[in-house]
Amino acid sequence: SSLVGSEMCIRDRFNNARQKQENQIKAIRSYISQRVDYIVFSPIVEDGWETVLQEAKEADIPVIVMDRNVSCDPSLYTAWVGSDFTEEGRNAARWLEEDLKGKKFDQKETVHIVVLRGTSNASATLGRTKGFAEIAKTHPNWEILDSDDADFTTAKGREVMEKYLQKYKDIDVVVSQNDDMTFGAIEAIRAAGKTTGTGGDITLISFDGTRSALEKVKSGVINVDIECNPLQGTYIQEIINRLEDGESVDKINYVEEKVYTQKNVLSVLGDRVY
C-alpha cells in the first residue's frame, strides 16, 4: 500500500491458501519479500507460525491476525481481531440453562447432549468446546453422550449426526459448532423421522449466525444461533489507522456478537449481509 497525505490507499494483495498451512506460510513469505506495509491473515491452524512471523518481525512488517488464534509468542504479531470463541460456547450453555428452566425440566432428569465439533484444533472448535463444557460441568444432569469432529461441513455434519442417531435412541440436544454442520444434522434428523427446533423432538443449538441459518431460527427449525461476526474489516482498518498515526493498539480485539432466537431474529434479518 502507499500513503498519500492523510489518505490511505490500500492495495489488497489477496491469496487464497485453500485450507493449507504451507500455502499460507508461502504467501506470507512472498508478502515479506514484496515489502508490504501490513500483513493480515486468518491462520488455518494455531501452531507452527513462529518462524514466518519472526521473519515478518525482522522485516519490520506489522502482522494483524484475524478470526483464528495463533499459539506463539504474542510479541511476534501486532494485534489479533476476532471472536471470543470460548464466550460463544458459554453463551450456548447459558441459553440452554434458561431454555430448560422455561420448559420446567426436572433438574434431576438427565439431559442427553451430542456435540458436532468443527475441525480438530481450530480455534473455534477449541473455544466453543471449552466454553460450553465450563458451564455443562456445573449441571450434573447434563450428559454429553458424544462429541465428534464434523469438520465444519454439511456432508460431515449429516454423517456424524446419522451415526449419533443410530447409536443413541434418546438425544435431547444437539450442539453444532457451525451452521453448515447444522444443515447436515437437520437432514439426518428429518431422515430419521424426528423434528428439531421449537416444539420439536430435539433442541438444536448452532453457531455462526449466517442468513440462511437465521431464516431457520425464524421458522423455528433451529432453536438458537450464537453469532460469530465475520465483519472484522472495520476493526482491522481502525487498527491500521491507529498504527499509521503512531498510536498504540490493543493486542486482543474482540468483535461484538449476539445470540439469536425467534424472539430477536427479525431485527437483524432485514439487513444481514452474511
Q: Could you tell me what each predicted segment is?
A:
Residues 14-16, 72-98, 147, 219-230:
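Short beta-strand elements at the ligand-binding edges of bilobed clamshell
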